[in-house]
Design a protein with these regions (language model features):
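PAPS-dependent sulfotransferase catalytic core
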Residues: 2-118, 124-125
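PAPS-dependent sulfotransferases, especially Golgi type II membrane carbohydrate sulfotransferases
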Residues: 2-33, 284-365
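PAPS/PAP-binding and catalytic site of the sulfotransferase fold
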Residues: 43-54, 261-287, 301-321
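Hydrophobic, Leu/Ile/Phe/Ala-enriched alpha-helical segments that form helix-helix packing faces
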Residues: 47, 51, 55, 106-110, ...
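Conserved beta-strand scaffold positions in the cores of enzyme catalytic domains, especially
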Residues: 59, 119-121, 191, 258-260, ...
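Soluble or luminal CAZymes and related metallo-dependent hydrolases
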Residues: 94-105, 173, 222-229, 269, ...
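Nucleic-acid enzyme cleavage-core boundary/entry regions
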Residues: 94-110, 114-117, 124-143, 180, ...
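PAPS-dependent sulfotransferase catalytic domain
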Residues: 125-288
């Protein structure tokens, strides 16, 4: 049970040629608030590991995860023996991890980083940011409902004078905000979505989450074995950038926003994908490093379950092949690891998620 507690503690020139506007674009756009909207098991740790090597970036992962999973307002409803034991013995460690505190802390962090003249890069799994009502409206299965708390935007990312003006000024969004983040703050973020084929995502999720007692049939499976949340937020940002205020905020090259990165493109063409991303963000890609020191997580089973590959690596580990997975072939492999019911559930959820994946893939860089 302590594991859960511990867990919480040459291409460049080709790319430039394919996107000729980018060299000028780098000089015109400065995105100081970059937010990676990820999903579990989409190689988001790889993207983050590469990008955090940039000297202009200060990074923070998962500002809302503990509130979603373990705080007093938690929206995760999975119940297992290991989690019941954890909540009975955590000593109130997460009693103060409310969504409001997470928001205030994130806004304060943004202000502190920007005051140093740096960019902030944040990352959170999109599902952890979607409101309960949006979850409920998009999940067919009946599951316990827990309401999302109403958050106050204290505008802590702004100076005091700006804060007063921001609190007085409200601008209606073109479509409803599906997240817990305040409208004002959501508009200031530069969204980067990282996606991956669901036939790779869902089995990886079940393997890694086994330590928490997760199954394909528990009450949290509808949260995590879908790509709906990323598509919902992607469509929100597409609509935002199509309206005058949003288009102005995007600046030149707004047709490339929101940014979508496919994990397998990132793995197999890391230099090309990162070069495109940096240039779209107004960052010089030259300082980026693609090698790093391995990290020993052998004493932490929970972290190892999710981070073994990236922790043991010293650079990008390319895929064995570039072809998209074939579901029937994948299912035969799953049958060696899981029972018939689980394999069928994964197949069904993969089929359901394919439309969302293919839709988002069309928007990838």
């Amino acid at each position: 049970m302590s594991d859960i507690n511990i867990y919480l503690a040459g291409c460049i020139s080709d790319v430039s040629a394919s996107l000729p506007f980018l060299s000028d674009y780098m000089d015109k756009r400065r995105n100081t608030r970059i937010f990676i909207f990820s999903h579990l098991r989409t190689a988001s740790h790889l993207l983050f590991r590469i990008m955090e090597s940039h000297p202009s970036l200060t990074t923070k992962q998962y500002p809302f995860m503990e509130a979603f999973l373990f705080g007093p307002e938690r929206l995760s409803v999975r119940r297992t023996d290991s989690l019941d034991d954890f909540f009975a013995n955590d000593g109130g460690k997460f009693a103060g991890h409310t969504f409001q505190k997470c928001l205030d802390d994130m806004e304060t962090l943004i202000k502190d980083i920007e005051s140093e003249g740096k960019y902030v890069m944040l990352k959170e799994h999109t599902v952890h940011l979607i409101t309960s009502r949006v979850h409920e409206a998009n999940i067919e299965e009946k599951r316990p409902f827990r309401p999302t708390p109403v958050l106050q935007d204290h505008c802590l990312d702004l100076d005091e004078a700006q804060r007063v003006d921001a609190m007085r000024t409200t601008t209606a969004l073109p479509i409803p905000n599906p997240t817990i983040l305040p409208d004002r703050l959501l508009k200031t973020l530069t969204p980067v979505f990282i996606i991956r084929h669901p036939a790779l995502v869902f089995p990886s999720y079940l393997r890694a989450s086994k330590i928490f007692g997760a199954t394909a049939f528990d009450d949290d499976a509808p949260f995590y074995m879908t790509l709906k949340w990323q598509r919902l937020l992607l469509d929100f940002y597409k609509t935002w950038y199509s309206c005058p205020e949003g288009a102005k905020s995007a600046g030149p090259g707004r047709e490339h926003f929101p940014i979508v990165i496919d994990a397998d493109k990132l793995i197999n063409d890391s230099h090309g994908q990162i070069d495109k991303l940096c240039r779209l963000l107004g960052l010089d890609p030259a300082p980026i490093r693609f090698t790093w020191e391995a990290q020993d997580r052998s004493g932490n089973r929970a972290q190892a379950a999710f981070l073994t590959t990236i922790s043991n690596s010293t650079g990008v580990i390319k895929s064995k092949g570039s072809k998209l997975p074939v579901l029937e072939d994948e299912a035969r492999e799953w049958a060696k690891e899981w029972d018939v019911e689980t394999v069928q559930a994964m197949k069904s959820r993969t089929e359901d998620a394919m439309e969302d994946y293919e839709y988002m893939l069309k928007h990838s860089i």
